[in-house]
Design a protein with these regions (language model features):
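Non-catalytic helical/linker scaffolds that mediate oligomerization, partner binding
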Residues: 1-382
Length: 382
């Protein structure tokens, strides 16, 4: 069974000896953090991850956690460390995770710096302070994904308010069709123990119920005594939640306002699944935008996103429900329809006799909107 929700593992001393198991195991992405290693160590880790993912054929994403500069003698972030961004670009990571330092200009600077290097690196903005929460709508406009850092966010707001704010952030990210990652002490007891507490199991499960795209482990894998066991535990919890169909797709409906035609077609794709028994959705997409909007409605079958290159594919591996597939050739509509069955069979999403739903979008306009869908088609796998 395909696991829809994704898992991110933070790399550190504890994972160095078991990195192959991490890359070939349950992790969909890894996070490299300068807190757990210097530049020399992190370059070595990045290169090892790249070699292992190439060897295993997995499109595992690499996220680099960017440092921040503090005001002198004050616990206040004032800017993002641009040298860290340069390091991330030089090492061809897939995402950079940036703190929100009180103004959107710093995030815009990061995007411009990445562009100046000629890189297509996704921007994850960490909601790690009240300013980040207060500016959430603007952040969702410019970020590719957000990360709820409960550790630092919990310092800036009352702890009793944190659960409600967490749920609100997840909901608003879902509505904006942006990836939302939850982190901090997901299975913290497993830093020292081989089994999680019942409360931690519930925390992970409730995150999936609420609609997060990905759960991220930090100390559990970076410095813990049981990194592989922690990863396997999160995997089992998520699979059990999804197997029991415990994620309420109906709460991801959008009501009460007009939407674009392309957005409406994505929603219609979801509704077609309720009327027709299909095993998967195959969507042809240049940038991944169409696939993200379809996945935003939490369909009960996987979304096979057919993309032209691995760089684009790795941008989708942290999005819930999406399985990337590389097809570098430009296909005609007839080829799209005929090839979809073969792609689905190849990755194990459908068998002969199953029905699949096929969609295709026009090239991205570059304006941040969903490209118009050319067709929606239901086909039998032969």
């Amino acid at each position: 069974m395909i696991r829809n929700s994704k898992i991110i593992a933070t790399i550190g001393d504890a994972t160095d000896k078991v990195l192959r198991k991490i890359v070939e195991g349950a992790a969909d992405a890894v996070l490299i953090d300068s807190y757990y290693g210097n530049n020399e160590q992190n370059v070595e880790r990045i290169e090892k991850v790249k070699a292992l993912r190439e060897e295993s054929g997995r499109d595992l994403a690499i996220i680099y956690d960017v440092d921040h500069i503090y005001a002198k003698n004050k616990y206040k972030l004032i800017r993002i460390d641009e040298e860290n961004v340069d390091f991330a670009c030089a090492n061809d990571v897939d995402f950079v995770a940036c703190p929100f330092v009180g103004n959107l200009e710093e995030i815009t600077k990061v995007k411009e710096l990445v562009k100046s290097h000629g890189k297509n690196i996704g921007i994850i903005v960490k909601i790690d302070c009240k300013d980040g929460y207060d500016n959430l709508d603007d952040i969702l406009e410019i970020a590719d994904a957000i990360m709820i850092n409960r550790d630092e966010l919990g310092v800036d707001i009352s702890y009793e308010d944190l659960p409600g704010i967490q749920k609100e952030i997840v909901r608003r990210a879902n509505e904006a069709a942006k990836v939302v990652i939850l982190t901090t002490q997901m299975l913290y007891s497993m830093v020292y123990n081989p089994r999680p507490t019942r409360a931690e199991v519930s925390d992970v499960a409730n995150a999936i119920f609420d609609g997060v795209d990905a759960v991220m482990l930090t100390e559990e894998t970076a410095i813990g005594d049981y990194p592989c066991e922690a990863l396997e535990t999160v995997d089992r919890i998520i699979r059990t939640v999804e197997k029991n169909n415990a994620v309420d797709a109906e709460r991801f409906e959008v009501e009460g306002y007009k939407m674009s035609i392309s957005h409406a077609v994505s929603m219609t794709t979801k509704h077609l699944l309720e009327a027709v028994d299909v095993k998967s959705i195959v969507t042809y997409t240049k940038s991944g935008t169409t696939a993200r909007f379809i996945a935003r409605y939490r369909p009960n079958v996987p979304v096979l996103a057919v993309l032209p290159d691995r760089e684009s594919a790795r941008k989708l591996v942290i999005t819930r429900g999406i399985v990337p597939y590389i097809e570098p050739k430009m296909l005609s509509m007839e080829e799209m329809l005929s090839n979809a069955s073969e792609y689905s069979k190849e990755v194990g999403l459908a068998e002969v006799g199953d029905s699949i739903l096929i969609t295709a979008g026009q090239p991205d306009t570059g304006k941040g909107t969903v490209p118009p869908t050319d067709f929606v088609y239901i086909s039998k796998v032969d």
